[in-house]
Amino acid sequence: MSLLTEVETPIRNEWGCRCNDSSDPLVIAANIIGILHLILWILDRLFFKCIYRRFKYGLKRGPSTEGVPESMREEYRKEQQNAVDVDDGHFVNIELE
């Protein structure tokens, strides 16, 4: 008899659980792991753009701005932002000359 048929056996015209060993520590641990996995999967699907963009581009440091005038820094920031804003649905690789 498989676990599926054992768990989903009709009891008095209702679907119920016949197994009384649900207080087993292994069952409790498996339930906790399953719930955590579900929560992490939902968060991953909701925020995958932010998460993967941060890992792909956020951990890399940009070029050093030491000794560069503030006006040139601001111009560089605007260029970078415009390049990213072109298509928010896709990542844009920028090669500087």
Swiss-Prot record:
Positions of the record's site feature: Seems to be involved in pH gating: 41
Parts of the chain that traverse the membrane: 23-43
Taxonomic superkingdom: Viruses
A Pfam family reported for this protein in Swiss-Prot or TrEMBL: Flu_M2
Virion surface face of the membrane: 1-22
GO molecular function: monoatomic ion channel activity; proton transmembrane transporter activity
Glycosylated residues, chain numbering: 20
Residues recorded as bearing Phosphoserine in the entry: 64
Other observations noted: When the channel is activated, one or more imidazole moieties of His-37 probably become bi-protonated.
Known function: Forms a proton-selective ion channel that is necessary for the efficient release of the viral genome during virus entry. After attaching to the cell surface, the virion enters the cell by endocytosis. Acidification of the endosome triggers M2 ion channel activity.
Protein's name in the database: Matrix protein 2
Source organism of the structure: Influenza A virus (strain A/Wilson-Smith/1933 H1N1) (Influenza A virus (strain A/WS/1933 H1N1))
